[in-house]
Amino acid sequence: MKIAIFDRDGTLNVLGNEYIATPDEWIPIPGALEAVARLSRAGWHVVIATNQPGLGRGVIDVHALNAIHSRMLKQVAALGGRIDAVFFCPHSDAEHCSCRKPAPGLMEQIRDRYGVERSEMVAVGSALSHLQAAAAIGVPQLHLVCTGAAAEMDVPTGVLPAPWPEGTHVHTDLTAFADFITAARAAKATAH
């Protein structure tokens, strides 16, 4: 089983001013959902791991969050793909929990729920905290997409400075990430 763990805000959807509190405020980045659907159709299990501190701060409630995620799931399904699950941390940074990225709690929950080896996991996101959380449990393939928080990064060589986890691959967007992953999988299959 291969699992691709995506960050949500800034990776799948356009970042809002503060918190995305309604389904109408959740706007996908062009091409992002198509890339997710493509990976899903290629046999990847797609899982979302997202910090949602607006819950802990009372800015958004769980019903609104579920409505946002329902919209996201339906849009991916309309493209022939599937998101298997959404894992979220509801805590604010002041709560010092073990699930708020960059802490590894969400990634551990995903690994344990699916019963997969770290070698079968790939993490992709636009935020340092997402990749740090994945690196903390030993996810071997880390992928930065230069959207959202990383949109202003200038990484001409593809080599990221500290504190980015060593070996992080850099892609312009999720379409480029999907191209990379599917090409790598095809090359691996051809080699056998």
Locate predicted features.
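Non-catalytic pre-domain segments flanking phosphatase-related domains
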Residues: 1-8, 179-192
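Active-site neighborhood of HAD-like aspartate-dependent phosphohydrolases
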Residues: 1-47
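Short, solvent-exposed loop/turn segments at secondary-structure junctions
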Residues: 20-21, 54-59, 131
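Substrate-recognition element of Asp-dependent hydrolases with the DxDx(T/V) motif
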Residues: 32, 36-72, 82-98
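Anion (oxyanion) recognition and catalysis
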Residues: 37-41, 77, 135
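Structural recognition of alpha->loop->beta junctions
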Residues: 69-85, 157-183
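Conserved Lys-Pro-Asp/Glu-containing loop-to-beta segment of HAD-superfamily phosphomonoesterases
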Residues: 101-134
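Acidic, Mg2+-coordinating phosphoryl-transfer loop and its flanking beta/alpha structural elements
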Residues: 123-169
